[in-house]
């Protein structure tokens, strides 16, 4: 069985992430969506909230698992008995960073493969950072995230303003 891990902060999960998971789920028997704690990044949502949002947003897919993690990615890939990781490349600017990560992961775990998927063109400009910025200023993010994520963003920013 070919299983891959799709790691990310998913703060929050976007339609771009969901598109990548849907396509990966057709290519592999199983996809583990690994939500990184990423405390250094200072995420808006807690790890538990991000895991929950991802689980709900991806509940229509039967061959996926969502989990949080706070360890080396190579250790999670080993634990999940995965073939490697899948990552999205939105633009050339993503490539340099992802190439560096892939090489570092290969140095740490020589058998771990890094696979890259490009997004659907109409989703290529979406990023969690931009979505959060738009939402924080009261903008409409309905084209970029599922309704449940849009509601969670509204609630979170209202909570922060209170």
From Swiss-Prot:
Gene: coaD
Top-level taxonomic group: Bacteria
Enzyme Commission code: 2.7.7.3
Family: Belongs to the bacterial CoaD family.
Cofactor(s) needed for function: Mg(2+)
Main location group: cytoplasm
GO cellular component term of the entry, any: cytoplasm
GO molecular function, one term: pantetheine-phosphate adenylyltransferase activity
PANTHER family for the chain: PHOSPHOPANTETHEINE ADENYLYLTRANSFERASE
Pfam families: CTP_transf_like
Site residues by UniProt (Transition state stabilizer): 17
GO process terms (BP): coenzyme A biosynthetic process
Associated pathway: Cofactor biosynthesis; coenzyme A biosynthesis; CoA from (R)-pantothenate: step 4/5
Biological function: Reversibly transfers an adenylyl group from ATP to 4'-phosphopantetheine, yielding dephospho-CoA (dPCoA) and pyrophosphate.
Residues reported in the UniProt entry to bind substrate: 9, 41, 73, 87
Oligomeric form and interacting partners: Homohexamer.
Protein name, UniProt field: Phosphopantetheine adenylyltransferase
Binding sites annotated in the UniProt record for ATP: 9-10, 17, 88-90, 98, 123-129
Subcellular compartments: Cytoplasm
Keywords from the UniProt entry: ATP-binding, Coenzyme A biosynthesis, Cytoplasm, Magnesium, Nucleotide-binding, Nucleotidyltransferase, Transferase
Catalytic activity as recorded in UniProt: (R)-4'-phosphopantetheine + ATP + H(+) = 3'-dephospho-CoA + diphosphate
């Amino acid at each position: 069985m070919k299983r891959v891990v799709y790691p990310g902060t998913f703060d929050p999960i976007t339609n771009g992430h969901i598109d990548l998971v849907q396509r990966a789920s057709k290519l592999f028997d199983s996809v583990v969506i690994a939500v990184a704690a990423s405390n250094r990044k200072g995420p808006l949502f807690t790890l538990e909230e991000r895991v929950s949002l991802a689980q709900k947003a991806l509940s229509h897919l039967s061959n996926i698992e969502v989990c949080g993690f706070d360890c080396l990615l190579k250790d999670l890939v080993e634990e999940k008995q995965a073939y490697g990781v899948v990552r999205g490349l939105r633009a050339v600017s993503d490539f340099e960073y992802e190439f560096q990560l892939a090489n570092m992961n290969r140095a740490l775990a020589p058998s771990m493969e890094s696979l890259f998927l490009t997004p659907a063109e109409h989703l290529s400009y979406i990023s969690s950072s931009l979505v959060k910025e738009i939402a924080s200023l009261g903008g409409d993010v309905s084209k970029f995230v599922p309704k449940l994520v849009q509601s969670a963003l509204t609630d979170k920013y209202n909570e922060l303003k209170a």
